[in-house]
């Protein structure tokens, strides 16, 4: 049916044709989403559908946070379309992960935030991780320690330092996200940081920092003078 097509638009304005001609960088978020969705719904062509979906979900960041089930609550989003969109968003999230053959160098809190921001800012639960570093501050690995509210009873020093010891690392960075988007440290965050810092001194593994990831924001406890 006609409402499912963009037949009234000149061919050079169609999202897919624009991608072929100018490249993906030239497309708006609405146009890229329209290519993924492929078809509109009754009364809306696919560009209008895409615009509405971005508006109702709060933009790309809001869209990325939704589960498949939550996506299907929006008009025009069936289970197949929701699953395809979620898979595309997940693929994009994974693509920002660094090439495992290239070890990033961490010289500042900004470096570690840049490394993990696009993945961790969208997580809907707290994930606590430990970054193991070489003597020249190359990332040797990032270990997942716990999922859920950060609590000193759940974060045992043994688990935090195990991978660092295995990798012969002499320094680590603590890392976790706040799903609320606000990276302000809680009293529990501070307690865990100090406890692990004390444990690191005993083991000879320095805790360089604890970086908390929010929604495109971060806080370094080192920069705050807490560590």
From Swiss-Prot:
The keyword Metal-binding applies. Gene3D superfamilies: Cytidine Deaminase, domain 2. A motif (JAMM motif) lies at residues 176-189. Keywords: Hydrolase, Metal-binding, Metalloprotease, Protease, Zinc. Zn(2+) binds at residues 176, 178, 189. One of its GO terms (molecular function) is metallopeptidase activity. CDD domains: MPN_DUF2466 (cd08071). GO terms for biological process: proteolysis. It comes from the Bacteria. Pfam families: RadC, UPF0758_N. The keyword RNA-binding does not apply. InterPro entries: MPN, RadC_JAB, RuvA_2-like, UPF0758, UPF0758_CS, UPF0758_N. Residues 105-227 form the MPN domain. Belongs to the UPF0758 family. PANTHER family: DNA REPAIR PROTEIN RADC, UPF0758 PROTEIN YEES-RELATED. This is UPF0758 protein DSY3180.
């Amino acid at each position: 049916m006609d409402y499912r097509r963009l037949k009234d638009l000149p061919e050079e304005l169609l999202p897919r044709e624009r991608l072929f001609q100018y490249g993906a960088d030239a497309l708006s978020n609405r146009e890229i989403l329209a290519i993924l969705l492929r078809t509109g719904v009754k009364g809306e062509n696919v560009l209008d559908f895409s615009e509405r979906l971005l508006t109702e979900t709060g933009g790309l960041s809001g869209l990325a946070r939704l589960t498949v089930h939550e996506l299907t609550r929006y008009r025009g989003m069936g289970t197949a379309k929701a699953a395809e969109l979620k898979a595309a968003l997940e693929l994009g999230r994974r693509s920002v992960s660094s090439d495992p053959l290239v070890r990033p160098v961490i010289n500042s809190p900004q470096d570690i935030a840049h490394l993990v921001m696009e993945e961790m800012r969208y997580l809907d639960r707290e994930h606590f991780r430990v970054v193991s570093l070489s003597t020249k501050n190359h990332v040797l690995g990032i270990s997942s320690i716990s999922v859920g509210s950060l609590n000193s009873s759940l974060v045992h020093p043994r688990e935090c330092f195990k991978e660092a010891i295995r990798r012969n690392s002499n320094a680590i960075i603590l890392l976790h996200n706040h799903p609320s988007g606000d990276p302000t440290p809680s009293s529990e965050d501070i307690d865990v940081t100090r406890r692990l810092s004390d444990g690191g001194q005993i083991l000879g593994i320095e805790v360089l920092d604890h970086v908390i990831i929010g929604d495109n924001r971060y806080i370094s406890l080192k920069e705050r003078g807490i560590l």
